[in-house]
Design a protein with these regions (language model features):
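Fe(II)/2-oxoglutarate oxygenase catalytic core
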Residues: 1-192, 198-254
Length: 254
């Protein structure tokens, strides 16, 4: 009975993602994993950060260096996981849940012959990011400005008792669908945000004055991704700050 209820819930969320991305380009889902799982993910992320494995995030065309140039653009630290690492079982569950929603998203679009019809053929590993307070930020940017294949950004927040009025750290979006408006999203515990990765959604992380964590997965437009590989003549991992060991996982069951 519980499995049946969960599948119905996932389908309902998937329908919301289809509807909201089509209409607004953004979809926000609260209480995504449930409080208990969300707090377990929070503890796992904090524990990983405390081991010192996170590295400075990089940006296209800029190297993370002592000059501070890259830090002026983004000042987060990141690491990549696939869920098989120690103490990552609940993160693996999160990844599987998002995969299911994206698979449902594809099926719904196929059945309705609407929305994004190009097959989504893979994704990155999950990038865990930490903005370590002290005004750490990421300036206004687009995840995929140059057709590198990234189609949908899925970001999950694990920040307990977050109050943006006191600590900042808002995700501010400038959606093309609402050219006269901005959308401010607080990075609260157990909140998931889906949005188009291309130029339809410029966004920024405003200065954060408390440690701020997020987990992000990018899903690929299969055709655009292959074109990007051919164009670059290399099998690169599009996720900035990564290396070839973090290349996309194919969703062969889609």
């Amino acid at each position: 009975m519980q499995d049946s209820f969960r599948m119905e819930w996932l389908l309902e969320i998937s329908q919301c993602v289809v509807r909201d991305l089509e209409k607004y380009g953004i979809c926000v889902v609260d209480n995504f994993m449930g409080k208990e799982r969300a707090e377990t993910i929070h503890r796992s992320v904090v524990s990983m950060y405390e081991t010192g494995i996170f590295v400075e995030g990089e940006t296209v065309g800029l190297k993370s260096s002592k000059t501070g140039t890259a830090k002026n653009v983004r000042s987060d630290k990141i690491t990549w996981v696939d869920g098989s690492e120690n103490n990552c079982a609940t993160i693996a569950h999160l990844i599987a849940t998002v995969d299911t929603i994206i698979m449902n998203f594809i099926r719904i679009n196929r059945l309705t012959q609407s929305g994004h019809q190009t097959p989504i053929g893979g994704r990155t590993k999950a990038m865990i990011s930490c903005y370590p307070g002290n005004g750490s930020h990421y300036v206004k940017h687009v995840d995929n400005p140059n057709r590198d294949g990234r189609c949908i950004t899925a970001t999950y927040y694990v920040n307990k008792d977050w109050d943006a009025k006191e600590t900042g750290g808002l995700l501010r979006m400038f959606p093309q669908a609402w050219p006269t408006k901005v959308v401010d999203i607080e990075p609260i515990l157990d909140r998931m945000v889906f949005f188009w990765s291309d130029r339809r959604n410029p966004h920024e992380v405003q200065p954060s004055f408390r440690t701020r964590y997020a987990i992000t997965i990018w899903y690929f437009d299969a055709k655009e991704r292959e074109e990007a590989k051919e164009r670059n003549n290399v099998k690169t991992n599009v996720a900035v700050g990564s290396d070839e060991n973090k290349t996309a996982t194919l969703l062969s069951h889609i």
